[in-house]
């Protein structure tokens, strides 16, 4: 009996070690293939990755879940840098930004950065970069961080939620977030996914995010999904999403306090962040908020319909007196 127990223990240790070794190897490869494209700045001991380009009024771009600044530098930012000073920021735990402090990042925990915590950290980073009265655009999860920015601070020109999370949703999230956002999944499942996730899995995931449109050619190679498959990033992402809803409930009750222009852009075929649950309610919650509805468009309008998103940015700039 003892020999059997020892044998099982040795097998478990070997398997665990193999998984961790393979995950670490893939993380090193991801870091080499997709290094920081901007600068690493320190905010109260937290490293924040920021990329600055262009000239004009300040425009901050916040990526969504599983993303990083490369989502915007694929093509979108180039369309704007001739008339805006663009500040791209990796959200906590994703890309090359650290978790927001020592209270986060535990393997066997569900500690996560709320939208308000993220907004405060990224606002401090933007301040270091000299941002003045910025427009804050947030895609998907970045949308709720942009709205938190407006609730936490009043020195911004306006908010552009793009397919942005804004209101509480019914039902449960999918298994990926419920499992990996739990303490046991964070510790046990994340390393396995990090070690063995295939390119087919990545391709299928990206395709589902863009549906019903198709991802642009070259997008996957540029954006670097391997960065998100790192154990630390997977944990940060899953926990932030899995435990997001209570924060959205709290924030949505305060939207009436937002007194800056809000111009949302949302596709009516978005099944990830549905229009009717999220952006469609904003005009009743925020005085003067507008929503541009894109018929037949899914979750990635800044790639599939960039002109509509740029027009929303320009409307905020005009309403705020920046143009």
Specify the residue positions occupied by each region the protein language model found.
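Alpha/beta-hydrolase fold catalytic core
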Residues: 1-59, 81-84, 109, 113, ...
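Conserved alpha/beta-hydrolase catalytic His-Asp/Glu region
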Residues: 29, 173-174, 194-257
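Conserved HGGG/HGGXW glycine-rich cap/lid loop of the alpha/beta-hydrolase fold
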Residues: 46, 53-98
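Active-site loop/oxyanion-hole signature of alpha/beta-hydrolase fold enzymes
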Residues: 51-53, 88-137
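Conserved hydrolase catalytic core segment
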Residues: 132-171
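Flexible "cap/lid" loop of the alpha/beta hydrolase fold
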Residues: 159-191
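Catalytic active-site module of serine/aspartate enzymes centered on a nucleophile-bearing elbow/loop
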Residues: 287-323
């Amino acid at each position: 009996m003892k020999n059997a127990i020892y044998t099982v223990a040795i097998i478990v240790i070997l398997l665990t070690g193999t998984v961790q070794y393979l995950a670490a190897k893939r993380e090193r490869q991801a870091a080499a293939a997709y290094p920081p494209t901007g600068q690493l700045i320190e905010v109260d001991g937290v490293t924040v990755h920021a990329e600055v380009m262009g000239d004009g009024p300040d425009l901050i771009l916040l990526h969504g879940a599983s993303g990083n600044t490369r989502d915007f530098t694929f093509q979108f930012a180039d369309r704007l840098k001739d008339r805006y000073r663009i500040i791209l920021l990796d959200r906590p735990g994703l890309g090359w930004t650290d978790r927001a402090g020592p209270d986060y990042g535990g393997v066997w925990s569900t500690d996560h950065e709320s939208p308000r915590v993220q907004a405060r950290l990224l606002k401090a980073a933007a301040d270091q970069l000299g941002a003045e009265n910025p427009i804050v655009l947030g895609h998907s999860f970045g949308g709720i961080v942009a709205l938190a920015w407006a609730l936490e601070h009043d020195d911004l020109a306006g908010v552009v939620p793009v397919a942005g999370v804004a209101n509480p949703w019914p039902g449960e999230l999918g298994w990926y977030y419920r499992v990996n956002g739990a303490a046991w999944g964070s510790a046990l499942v994340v390393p396995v996914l990090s070690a063995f996730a295939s390119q087919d899995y990545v391709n299928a995931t990206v395709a589902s995010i863009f549906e019903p449109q198709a991802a642009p050619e070259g997008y996957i190679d540029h954006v670097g999904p391997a960065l998100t498959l790192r154990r630390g990033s997977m944990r940060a992402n899953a926990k932030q999403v899995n435990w997001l809803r209570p924060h959205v409930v709290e924030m949505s009750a305060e939207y009436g306090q937002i007194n800056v222009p809000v111009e949302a852009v949302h596709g009516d075929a978005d099944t990830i962040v549905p229009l009717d649950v999220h952006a469609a309610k904003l005009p009743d919650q925020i005085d003067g908020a507008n929503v541009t509805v894109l018929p037949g468009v899914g979750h990635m309008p800044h790639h599939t319909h960039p002109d509509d998103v740029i027009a929303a940015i320009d409307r905020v700039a005009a309403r705020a007196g920046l143009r």
